[in-house]
Curated annotation (Swiss-Prot):
A motif ('HIGH' region) lies at residues 44-54. InterPro entries: aa-tRNA-synth_I_CS, aa-tRNA-synth_Ia, Anticodon_Ia_Val, M/V/L/I-tRNA-synth_anticd-bd, Rossmann-like_a/b/a_fold, tRNA-bd_arm, tRNAsynth_Ia_anticodon-bd, Val-tRNA_synth_C_sf. The lineage of its organism: Bacteria, Pseudomonadati, Acidobacteriota, Terriglobia, Bryobacterales. Belongs to the class-I aminoacyl-tRNA synthetase family. ValS type 1 subfamily. This is Valine--tRNA ligase. Catalyzes the attachment of valine to tRNA(Val). As ValRS can inadvertently accommodate and process structurally similar amino acids such as threonine, to avoid such errors, it has a 'posttransfer' editing activity that hydrolyzes mischarged Thr-tRNA(Val) in a tRNA-dependent manner. One of its GO terms (cellular component) is cytosol. Monomer.
Amino acid sequence: MQIEKVYEPQRFEPHWAQWWIDSNIFRANPESPGRVFSLVIPPPNVTGVLHIGHMLEHTEIDVSTRWHRMLGDNTLWLPGTDHAGIATQMVVARQLKEEGINYRDLGREKFEERVWQWKAQSGDTIKRQMVRLGASCDWSRERFTLDPGLSRAVREVFVSLYERGLLYRGEYMTNWCPSCNTAISDLEVAHADVAGHLWHIRYPVNGMPGRFVTVATTRPETMLGDTAIAVNAKDPRYQDLHGKTVQLPLMDREIPIILDDLADPQFGTGVVKVTPAHDPNDFEAGKRHNLAKIQVIDNNARMTAAAGPYAGLDRFDARKRVVSALEEIGALVKVEDYPLSLGKCDRCKTPVEPLISTQWFVKTKPLAEKAIAVVESGEIGFVPQNWTKTYYEWMYNIRDWCVSRQLWWGHRIPAWHCGECKEIIVAREAPKACPRCASENLTQDTDVLDTWFSSGLWPFSTLGWPDQTADLAKYYPTTLLITGFDILFFWVARMVMFGLEFMGEVPFKQVYIHGLVRDADRQKMSKTKGNVIDPLVVTEKYGTDAVRMALLQGAAPGTDIVLTEERMESSRAFANKIWNAARFLFMNADQSAAAPAEPTIEDRWIVSRLNAAAETANRAIEQYRYHELAQELWKFFWHEFCDWYLELKKVSATGWGNAVAAFETALRLLHPAMPFLTEELWQRLERKEGDPKSIALAQYPQYRAELADSEAEKEVAIIQEIVTLARTLRTESKLDPKQQLKGALYCRTASLAIAQRHADAIQKIARTTLEFKAEAPPKADVIRSTVEFDLVLDVPKVEEDPARKQKEREQLEKNIANSKRQLGDEVFLSKAPAKVVDSIRAKLVDYEAQLAKML
């Protein structure tokens, strides 16, 4: 059978991507027998496109999914997207702004219609990209977090939490983003260390002329809302101030001196200002002492009327004006540099403002206790295991979760406010009248739920809950979750809490946390650095399978992945090698008559090596050691199948049916990692009755003890050893690899007979005519030895080229310098795998030895 000369993955990859879907290859059936393997996708935001981090994640998921499917498991990978509340609203609001429309002027209903229109136009982008990249999802079960069924699940959970006393509404200090104009959770605040200042301000004590207390603050603009000064009751410096008041500078307001542990005698002056409306600790102190809450900064980060002459100013402009005014009246004692941890909105990077607002909260402590217990008991395991500690640290220190957002896009909170008696009715469906006063003047809460609320239900809401569906019964709990560390708390922990609360079972049994994809300099990829790799661009350039293999090569648990153009180019060469191997086989094998013949020594050897590779590959996938899978596949296909087996086959030129059979098994072994290439080649092989219609449904090779052939492995190892000796001598003697040579092989063990038995193969592959001698070797200029063999070559004398020698010396010196630079780089040594560092050290020793010979 003929196969195209040039490997062009762009020609066949789109075809198979669509064919798999059209042929229902990945469709799961809850009634099918077999062990269940199920997982859900971490739903990408509907606003986005796939980045290289997605491709890493999806490749790892796909490898595990395809492997389980080929093991015969009842396999489901459920896909979908997230409505991404804040992100989506910002995108559409920006589009409207470009059209000269303020989204608020449009009104909620019209704005929501516009968002749905936008979603219809761009919402399939993620799916198209995932399909193109080979994700073996069951697309018939694709879900969206705002689908009717999932929305019903959200309402059910919200109301149930409320009924169980685990959800409440209250006035609390929240993180407010002035740009997104909504409250955000603690996890959505990104803290950055910045250089700030500490302003020391004097407050005059009333009734004690000449007596002042000095307060240090990083936010002088908030002093306009001070309602007290606090000292510690045990601080001897301020015993005479108990029960006194001070006059608030700039505002001429009398405020009390309170006794509270908020003031630490060991920190600063031991006196703190108390601003209950603008600091979470002060808010709690205000509740303890029944202090007024004066809000001087509004939701847009501008000063309120309560700020007096500073009303209307931006908060940072107000800071400058306040500091200047304090200086003018002599109330500013000093200013000193002070490092700050500045909280910014993780999405828009605007500094957040602690503001008091009425929000909905989930009581997380009772939920977290159960979520901790299932990890402690081993019901859920983390890989790598060190993430368990991180999970515990957050769960043990968990705070109530603010779940309401001041947005229009999302799951609207199922609560209605009575316009007459102010009763709040939480219900699964819209009530017709107030149960307290019978008024029909009801208005639904305007807020929506945090996006992570609906995402937290993803493992069971996508399977039909709250209905008891066949899918839910079969595929929950899911088997595995593969995700990034950045959403361990946002998403993973919340799925555990909700799964236990509403399903009574863990949502998954194992969580594999993958690393980041970094560039050649181990830098994190970002648009600002200009080092972002677009997966669709590189897959078009190198082929999807090549990019997948390049990612898998670096995907060791607990490490980040370095992805470079060189690695992708190398992986494309690997795919091309397999393609050319197929061409060679197809040209030599008459498949219609390719019945297995009596196996030659190389046939027995390749079956044994393939058996060993299957053992390693299965173990690697099972343990999420995707890098070991890639290494084993590369070693087998390139070095064993192509470099040795096919070369030996050229010599024997028999048993092509055995070669095709081995190649077919090898394609199945490779399929989870490189699905497109393997499907293309597998479909060109002769089909037998009963064969599945896709390699994706074929059986994955398993280790079988009876296929291990130590005798064949020993004999081929001798062939390899002698050929390698000959090739090494050629290289050292700087001879043309194609030049025919003569030589003698000396051996005084039984291995000589094996070598003689395979003399034809050894001599043809080594391009060397040999004499085989059972004696010790003579002294010779061109000799190489191993434990059993000594090879002497008859090498013609060649005048050495001084220019070439100088060039080789310069290259060695360059290699030595590069190796020393890497080994002297502490950052590199701390991050590079031990194997890589050891390899560089070994190469350095070799380079220095070669250079010493030349000097």
